[in-house]
Structures are given as C-alpha cells and as structure tokens.
C-alpha cells in the first residue's frame, strides 16, 4: 500500500492540520516507509507459531520475574493524621474555599 501526496493532504485536512508542501512530502516518505515495513512483516509466515504474552519467556522463566501479590505495608492512618490541624472520623477537614 503506497500513499500519494493527495492522500497525505486529505488526511491532514481531516485531522484539521495545516501541512506545508515540504512537510507533506516528508510525511509521505515516512508513511510509505512505515507501510513498507508493515508489508514485510505481514509477508512472514507465522502459522504454527504460538503468540507470546511475554517475549522474554523465550530467554528466561517469566515466573521468576513476577512476584506474588502480598500485602507488604500496613495502613498507618492515625500516624499520618496526627500532625493534621483538623480530622473527623478518619477524614481530613479543610476550610471551605468555594461558596
């Protein structure tokens, strides 16, 4: 799939972007290079290859990198609220700023 300069200008118009002719030509080259790369990737036969959730698992055991979900800290609400000027029922009281 190759774009034309008209395509780039139309996309810029739809996106409400003002694009100078030199910028449009530069963008055209970049987009066509990108689409060329996508076509190369699509040409590779990947049938029979399982998708990878974590590509690093091909190198090392992913389970070692993921830890168990355990509580490591305790809630110290009272200690945090001790220096506060006003607290009620575990909530910080602040002055009203909007009438």
UniProtKB/Swiss-Prot annotation:
It catalyses: L-glutamyl-tRNA(Gln) + L-glutamine + ATP + H2O = L-glutaminyl-tRNA(Gln) + L-glutamate + ADP + phosphate + H(+); L-aspartyl-tRNA(Asn) + L-glutamine + ATP + H2O = L-asparaginyl-tRNA(Asn) + L-glutamate + ADP + phosphate + 2 H(+). It comes from the Bacteria. The keyword ATP-binding applies. The keyword ATP-binding applies. GO terms for molecular function: asparaginyl-tRNA synthase (glutamine-hydrolyzing) activity; ATP binding; glutaminyl-tRNA synthase (glutamine-hydrolyzing) activity. Its EC number is 6.3.5.-. It is an enzyme of class 6 (ligase). Keywords: ATP-binding, Ligase, Nucleotide-binding, Protein biosynthesis. One of its GO terms (biological process) is regulation of translational fidelity. Belongs to the GatC family. Allows the formation of correctly charged Asn-tRNA(Asn) or Gln-tRNA(Gln) through the transamidation of misacylated Asp-tRNA(Asn) or Glu-tRNA(Gln) in organisms which lack either or both of asparaginyl-tRNA or glutaminyl-tRNA synthetases. The reaction takes place in the presence of glutamine and ATP through an activated phospho-Asp-tRNA(Asn) or phospho-Glu-tRNA(Gln). PANTHER family: GLUTAMYL-TRNA(GLN) AMIDOTRANSFERASE SUBUNIT C, MITOCHONDRIAL. Heterotrimer of A, B and C subunits. This is Aspartyl/glutamyl-tRNA(Asn/Gln) amidotransferase subunit C. It comes from Paraburkholderia phytofirmans (strain DSM 17436 / LMG 22146 / PsJN). The lineage of its organism: Bacteria, Pseudomonadati, Pseudomonadota, Betaproteobacteria, Burkholderiales.
């Amino acid at each position: 799939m190759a774009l034309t300069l008209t395509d780039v200008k139309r996309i810029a118009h739809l996106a409400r972007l003002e694009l100078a002719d030199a910028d449009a030509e530069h963008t055209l080259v970049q987009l066509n290079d990108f689409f060329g790369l996508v076509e190369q990737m699509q040409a590779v036969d990947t049938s029979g290859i399982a998708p990878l959730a974590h590509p690093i698992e091909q190198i090392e055991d992913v389970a070692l990198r993921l830890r168990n979900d355990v509580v490591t800290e305790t809630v110290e609400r009272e200690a945090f609220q001790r220096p506060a000027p006003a607290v009620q029922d575990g909530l910080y009281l602040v002055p009203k700023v909007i009438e």
